[in-house]
Each structure stands twice: as structure tokens, then as C-alpha cells.
């Protein structure tokens, strides 16, 4: 199948609207991607004609809803090439998935004197849960430092591991810098030291194929809303042997086998024992439609198109005076920048006046901001529906802001 950005754009209703009297140029998909009609329609159709509570229902609607939900689990397992659909847990998003691992596996396996390794480029969602776990149990949090070009100082990684290292928690792709970390060698090194590996894939799965078996990671987590799906739904992958050993971290309906006031409670098997309560079934249906949509476009096609667009954007941005770019030349998805000494909020506000949507702030990466000694950055992100013309508008807008503000 040949990739056509025009055909893709026609599937996203919001891209036809105007902002401040100008066509919308949506360059904020790394925060949350827009949704194609196929996703919107699938979720709406479920609520209109197929909604029911899943699991244990004997009536037709419940049985059909349960089947649809479990089919999405199967589709998601194929999407990341898991060995089994039963290695996947539905979560609210990447943040909940990481917290689940920290509170279930972490509480059972990390002890006083142990250590966990993260990096200086992590999103807060892959920092704070580990800080909280370390504080609870008396463990140490170790950090892989950054190079100025936005890559990790990988030569320091072997010195951070020891016999007390229990986990390496690392982002696949930086949400600020676009750096794609060399996971294969990092995971191999971690396993050589007996440590498990969690990968934050929130900024990776929409840009190119991900194969969790080839990576050999122990945990992989991503969100639906950055993958053109609904909010409030995501996937946590855990190797089956690990998942079966992990205790539940939330209690309630659906995650039990038996409940007795005198004899206590026994759990159902994984992954369902990690899905307490009524699930976000509509969101799951929408996620399934998003996975189907992205797969139909072809992730390799998407990767090729987006990389060409990224190369074009980086080359065109060289024409903007006083523009500071952050991150390596080879990157995925995002371009973080500042214009002169102007605050990112001011630059972002001007761009919004021109109909261009970018993200401004610390991007849930305060340690990274501290490393670059800036309070905030602007971030333009590129998705499969963005165009060369939108990149040109961004460049022209920044040039205009520079002329206005100096």
C-alpha cells in the first residue's frame, strides 16, 4: 500500500477546521494525537448499538462486548508481537502502567539497599513512581546522564549496574528530544546483571514497528491517545512468567476468583487480576480501531514518510535566526526549540495566532529542563498527517516572530 498523506488527512475531521481564521496546523501530536473518523465511529457505534458490561454476562450484548474487548487485546498483542494476548493488561495509559509495575512487581522485588536505574531524559511518569518506590523501601535511584546533543552517556551505564540493580526503566523515544535509545544493547546489559527492563514506549509505537520479543524487554507500556486512539486507555505488556508472579495492586470486581469474609480472597489469573472494576470498554474498542487504522497505513510507510518530513523540517528551521534546537540530528517525532531569549509561552502564543498548535512548557521533564538550564521549551511534533506545507508555516511563523520581537 502506498502512503498518501492527503488520504490520511481526509480521515481526520479536526484537520479541516480553522484557528484564528487560518487553517489549523496541528503540531502537538506528541502530547495527544488527533483521532480519525474510523476511531470516532467505532466507539460511537459501540455505545449506540453494542454497549454492555463485559465479563460474566449471559446475555447477547454482554457476550458480544466481551468478545470485542478481548479481540482488541489480541490485536494489540500482534501489534507489538507479544507471544500471547494474555501478556497484555489494559490500563488507563502509560502513567498507570508504570505505576502498576512499581506497586506490584516493585513492592515484591525491590528491597532496602537495592537500586533502580533511569535516565536524565525521562518523562515524569517514568521518574516519580520509581522515586516513590525507592522512598517506600529504602532503595537508591541511579541516573544515566545526558550528553549536550541529547543522547545518553552510555559509557556510564556499565558503572551504574551492580548486583543490587533490580530494574532499568528507560524511555524508548524521548518526548522532548526525539532521541531513540539503543534499547537492544541496554537490555542485554541489564539482563547480564540480572535486572529487569521496563520500556516507556509512549513516543515510539506510532512512529515505527515495535517487537517486544526481539527487544526482549520485560515490560513495555504505551498509551492509546498518542496512537490516534481514545484517551483513558493504554497497554502494559509483561512477560508471561513475570505477570503470573505479580500480585494485584487494585482490588474489586473482575479481578477475583473467590471472596470470603472468613477465608479471604483469591485472585483470578493474569492479566484479568490487574483489571479491577468496570473497564473502559468504549476506549478499548476505539483503541482497537486505532491499531487497525495505523496497521492499514503500514508502520514502515509511516516511518519513511515521517522521517523524510523530519529531515525537511530540520533543514528548513536552519533559516530561522536565533533558533536553538535541542536533541540529536537523528530523531523521531519531536523538535524542541527556543527562539532567542523569548519565553516559550510567548513564542507558542504567537504561533497560535497564526493557526499553528505547538506545546510549550517543561513537557513533564523538569530534570531535562534543568540540564539545559531553561525554564521551558517549545515543541513541535510531527505525525503521519502533517505536511511539508505545515512545516513551512512553522518556519515562516518563527521568522515573523523573530522580526517582531527581535
Swiss-Prot record:
List locations, semicolon-separated.
Cytoplasm
The active site lies at 364
Give me the Gene Ontology terms describing cellular component.
Answer: cytoplasm
Under the heading Gene3D superfamilies, the entry gives: Aspartate Aminotransferase, domain 1 (3.90.1150.10), Type I PLP-dependent aspartate aminotransferase-like (Major domain) (3.40.640.10)
Catalytic activity of the protein = (sulfur carrier)-H + L-cysteine = (sulfur carrier)-SH + L-alanine; L-selenocysteine + AH2 = hydrogenselenide + L-alanine + A + H(+)
The EC number of this protein is: 2.8.1.7, 4.4.1.16
Q: Which InterPro entries has this protein been placed in?
A: Aminotrans_V_dom (IPR000192), Aminotrans_V_PyrdxlP_BS (IPR020578), Cys_dSase_SufS (IPR010970), PyrdxlP-dep_Trfase (IPR015424), PyrdxlP-dep_Trfase_major (IPR015421), PyrdxlP-dep_Trfase_small (IPR015422)
Q: Which UniProt keywords apply?
A: Cytoplasm, Lyase, Pyridoxal phosphate, Transferase
Pathway(s) this gene product operates in, as recorded in its UniProt entry: Cofactor biosynthesis; iron-sulfur cluster biosynthesis
Cofactor(s) required for function per UniProt = pyridoxal 5'-phosphate
Residues where N6-(pyridoxal phosphate)lysine is found = 226
Q: Which GO terms describe its molecular function?
A: cysteine desulfurase activity; pyridoxal phosphate binding; selenocysteine lyase activity
GO terms in the biological process aspect are: cysteine metabolic process
Instruction: Note the subunit structure.
Output: Homodimer. Interacts with SufE and the SufBCD complex composed of SufB, SufC and SufD. The interaction with SufE is required to mediate the direct transfer of the sulfur atom from the S-sulfanylcysteine.
Name the family. Answer: Belongs to the class-V pyridoxal-phosphate-dependent aminotransferase family. Csd subfamily.
What name does this protein carry?
Answer: Cysteine desulfurase
Amino acid at each position: 500500500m502506498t502512503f498518501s498523506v492527503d488520504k490520511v488527512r481526509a480521515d481526520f475531521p479536526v484537520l479541516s477546521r480553522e484557528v484564528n481564521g487560518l487553517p489549523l496546523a496541528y503540531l502537538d501530536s506528541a502530547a495527544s494525537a488527533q483521532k480519525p473518523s474510523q476511531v470516532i465511529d467505532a466507539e460511537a457505534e459501540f455505545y449506540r448499538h453494542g454497549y454492555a458490561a463485559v465479563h460474566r454476562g449471559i446475555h447477547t450484548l454482554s457476550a458480544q462486548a466481551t468478545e470485542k474487548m478481548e479481540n482488541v487485546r489480541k490485536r494489540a498483542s500482534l501489534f507489538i508481537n507479544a507471544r500471547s494476548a494474555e501478556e497484555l493488561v489494559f490500563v488507563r495509559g502509560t502513567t498507570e502502567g508504570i505505576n502498576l509495575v512499581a506497586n506490584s512487581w516493585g513492592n515484591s522485588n525491590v528491597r532496602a539497599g537495592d537500586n533502580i536505574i533511569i535516565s536524565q531524559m525521562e518523562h515524569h511518569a517514568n521518574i516519580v513512581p520509581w522515586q516513590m518506590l525507592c522512598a517506600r523501601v529504602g532503595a537508591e535511584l541511579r541516573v544515566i546522564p545526558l550528553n549536550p546533543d541529547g543522547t545518553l552517556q552510555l559509557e556510564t551505564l556499565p558503572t551504574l549496574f551492580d548486583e543490587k540493580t533490580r530494574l532499568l526503566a528507560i524511555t524508548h523515544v524521548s518526548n522532548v528530544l526525539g532521541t531513540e535509545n539503543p534499547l537492544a544493547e541496554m537490555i542485554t546489559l541489564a539482563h547480564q546483571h540480572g535486572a529487569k527492563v521496563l520500556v516507556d514506549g509512549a513516543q515510539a509505537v506510532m512512529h515505527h514497528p515495535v517487537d517486544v520479543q526481539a527487544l526482549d524487554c520485560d515490560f513495555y507500556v504505551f498509551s492509546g491517545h498518542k496512537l490516534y486512539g481514545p484517551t483513558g486507555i493504554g497497554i502494559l505488556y509483561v512477560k508471561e512468567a513475570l505477570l503470573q508472579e505479580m500480585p494485584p495492586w487494585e482490588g474489586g470486581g473482575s479481578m477475583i476468583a473467590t471472596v470470603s469474609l472468613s477465608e479471604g480472597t483469591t485472585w483470578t489469573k493474569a492479566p484479568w487480576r490487574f483489571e479491577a472494576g468496570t473497564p473502559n470498554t468504549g476506549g478499548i474498542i476505539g483503541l482497537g480501531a486505532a491499531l487497525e487504522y495505523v496497521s492499514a497505513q503500514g508502520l514502515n510507510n509511516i516511518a519513511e514518510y515521517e522521517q523524510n518530513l523530519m529531515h525537511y523540517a530540520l533543514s528548513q528551521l536552519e533559516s530561522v535566526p536565533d533558533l536553538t534546537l535541542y536533541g540529536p540530528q537523528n530523531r523521531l517525532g519531536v523538535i524542541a526549540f527556543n527562539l532567542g531569549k523569548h519565553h516559550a509561552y510567548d513564542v507558542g502564543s504567537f504561533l497560535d495566532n497564526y493557526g499553528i498548535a505547538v506545546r510549550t512548557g517543561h513537557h513533564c521533564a523538569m530534570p531535562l529542563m534543568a540540564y539545559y538550564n531553561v525554564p521551558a521549551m517549545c515543541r513541535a511534533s510531527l505525525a503521519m498527517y502533517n505536511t511539508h506545507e505545515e512545516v513551512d508555516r512553522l518556519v515562516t511563523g518563527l521568522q515573523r516572530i523573530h522580526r517582531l520581537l527581535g
